Every structure is written in structure tokens, then in C-alpha cells.
């Protein structure tokens, strides 16, 4: 008898839920039936003057790798003359990305010491000045030292990496890209770089060059090729 009472109570409860659901649906339908949404006209005025800073589009500004954070004033990027010098503009109001071709040695001259972690370093301040103006960064990291300076940190050579001297300057050394020690050290650096800069709010792109003269894949020299 007790089991029958519990079952009957349960069935009544389910029926009540179904009835409440039906009533709710039909009540809502009755309320909204015949109610016409007010007409609304939306007009858009074309913007033909503003520069849209979308990823991978728009103006890209090249950044001198020897510059410091004051270049905005010294190079007049905060007050660039236009219209024959009658007026000035801030370049950062138009360019959305700041691209710098930098080298590994400038970012990690000593193993494990990354300039982006040092607020007192020139590179840290330079990159920070870009971000302060609402621009994203873009990078190429050169490792071949020919025709430039010491682009790969010498700790890589001291660790046993094989390489070659610049024919025009015996004091300048470059690693062979297929050398195992170079690859090990460079991979470690790139992993640390990715942790710091794998952020689309900070970085627009990082190009995949870096080998060869000027990081443009010209005259790449291998050890076993």
C-alpha cells in the first residue's frame, strides 16, 4: 500500500510538471502573439579617413635596432612633418605594427640572460615605448653575422658550436645552421622568446627568416653541405 501511494504521488508530480511547462509555453506565446516589433532604421556613415589597426593589415613601421626609446622625439616619429612641413602627425596614430630586425646577440648576449626581462636595458625600454603607443611588435631574429656585427652570442661558439669567420672581418663569427650545438642553444633561446612574446595583444607576427646574410637566406653556409 505504501509503495502504491509513493508511485501515485510521483506520477502526479510528473503530470504537474508537464502541465506547468505546457502552460508556461502557451502563456508566453499568447503574450507575444500579435505583438509586432517596432521598426527601426539603422544608417551607417562610411568612414573614409580613419586608419583601422587590424592584425596583418595596414601600416607597418620599421624600427632601427640601434635606436633607444627616445627615437620618437629624436627621429620625429611623434611629430612627423607632413603637408610640406605645415603640420605634424604621430606615426603611431597611423601605423599599427612596429617591425624590428634584431639579432640573437642583442637579446641574449649571456646565456639565460634575456633583455626583455631587464627593465634597465635599452631594448626593453625601446620595445616598451612601442607598446605604450598602442602598437604591436613584429620581429626577425638574425643569427648570421656577415656584413653586420656579432649576431650570434659568443657563448654558443664557446660551447663548441662550429662556424666560420666573416671574410671581411676575422673578429666576426657565424655558426653553421646544421651544427648540433648551435641548434640546441638556439632552440632554448626560441622557447624562452616564445614564452615572452607569444601574445597576439603584443605581437603581430614573427617572420621565419634569420639565416643567411641579413637574415634573408642569402648565401647560407652549412657545415655538411
Features from the language model and the residues they span:
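Residue-level detector of bioactive/disordered segments in secreted/extracellular proteins
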Residues: 6, 22-24, 45
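N-terminal substrate-binding region of glycoside hydrolase catalytic domains
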Residues: 31-181
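Short, intrinsically disordered, charge-balanced linker/junction segments flanking boundaries
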Residues: 28-29, 223-225
Amino acid at each position: 500500500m505504501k509503495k502504491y501511494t509513493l508511485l501515485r504521488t510521483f506520477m502526479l508530480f510528473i503530470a504537474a510538471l508537464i502541465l506547468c511547462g505546457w502552460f508556461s509555453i502557451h502563456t508566453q506565446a499568447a503574450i507575444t502573439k500579435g505583438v509586432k516589433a517596432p521598426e527601426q532604421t539603422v544608417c551607417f556613415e562610411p568612414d573614409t579617413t580613419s586608419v583601422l589597426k587590424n592584425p596583418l593589415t595596414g601600416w607597418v613601421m620599421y624600427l632601427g635596432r640601434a635606436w633607444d626609446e627616445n627615437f620618437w622625439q629624436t627621429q620625429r616619429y611623434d611629430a612627423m612633418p607632413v603637408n610640406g612641413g605645415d603640420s605634424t602627425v604621430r606615426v603611431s596614430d597611423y601605423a599599427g605594427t612596429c617591425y624590428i630586425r634584431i639579432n640573437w646577440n642583442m637579446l641574449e648576449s649571456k646565456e639565460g640572460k634575456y633583455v626583455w626581462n631587464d627593465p634597465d636595458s635599452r631594448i626593453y625600454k625601446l620595445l616598451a615605448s612601442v607598446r605604450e603607443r598602442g602598437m604591436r611588435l613584429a620581429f626577425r631574429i638574425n643569427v648570421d653575422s656577415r656584413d653586420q656585427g656579432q649576431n650570434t652570442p659568443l657563448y654558443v661558439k664557446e660551447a663548441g658550436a662550429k662556424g666560420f669567420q666573416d671574410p671581411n672581418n676575422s673578429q666576426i663569427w657565424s655558426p653553421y645552421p646544421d651544427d648540433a650545438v648551435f641548434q640546441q642553444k638556439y632552440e632554448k633561446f626560441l622557447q624562452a622568446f616564445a614564452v615572452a612574446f607569444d601574445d597576439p595583444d603584443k605581437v603581430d607576427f614573427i617572420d621565419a627568416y634569420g639565416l643567411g646574410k641579413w637574415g634573408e637566406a642569402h648565401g647560407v653556409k652549412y657545415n655538411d653541405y
